Amino acid sequence: MTSHPRILRPFTLPNGTELKNRLLMAPMTTCTGYFDGTVTSELVEYYRARAGSIGTIIVECCFIDDYGLAFPGAIGIDNDEKVAGLAKIAAAIKAEGSKAILQIYHGGRMVDPQLIGGRQPVAPSAIAAPRDGAATPRALSGAEVEGMIAKFGEGVRRAIQAGFDGVEIHGANTYLIQQFYSPNSNQRDDEWGGSRDNRAKFPLAVLDITH
């Protein structure tokens, strides 16, 4: 660190938020949430122990819809009842002087039906992920696509209510946002599919509503 002293200097974001240094902890899945997506005390203490010396902590991805959890022990931000638990994480991080960021996502076709009570996953198109045993998802209707965008916006509202300093949108790892952009998983023939510009509409709409 002594050979790169700028890393430890404060950094001010364009919106005026000052980070104590330029170190960030990436969002790493712990699979320690309750079965219903609520926060455990172990998870709160996990983040408390890592806060303080690092400038910003990005908390592991939170599903924005109850069809969206991609792994066991995932935490959610899909309803207002989840806010209280998430607020404990944000408070623990900020009490140590670090900024708290929450990553939000939807797993789309990468969701195992067993994680959502045996229901069929949803995705841009009814095309299964290229992996053994993957379920064929149900294609979202146009109205459901609009509703999903709104759910990302609601996720941001809840993150702010919980006291987080910011939100990171998870648009990688072949989850729902990336599924809309890829022609391998998006073969829709409406305004949300087809051309690259149309396939980019969902990611851009999510960005717009969460900005």
Label each PLM-derived region with a short phrase:
Residues 57-61, 100-104, 162-176:
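Short beta-strand segments at enzyme active-site cores
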Residues 74-101, 181-211:
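Alpha-helix-loop-beta-strand connector modules within alpha/beta enzyme cores
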Residues 64, 77, 113-140, 180-200:
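Aromatic- and acidic-residue-enriched carbohydrate-binding clefts of CAZyme catalytic domains
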Residues 1-105, 148, 156:
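N-terminal capping/small domains of soluble enzymes
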Residues 99, 105-164:
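Non-globular sequence segments
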Residues 93-94, 153-167, 208-211:
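Substrate-binding cleft of carbohydrate-active enzyme catalytic domains
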Residues 32, 65, 108-110, 173-175, ...:
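Feature marks short, surface-exposed loop/turn motifs that line or immediately flank catalytic pockets
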Residues 35-38, 149-153, 158-160, 191-205:
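Active-site glycine- and acidic-residue-rich loops that bind
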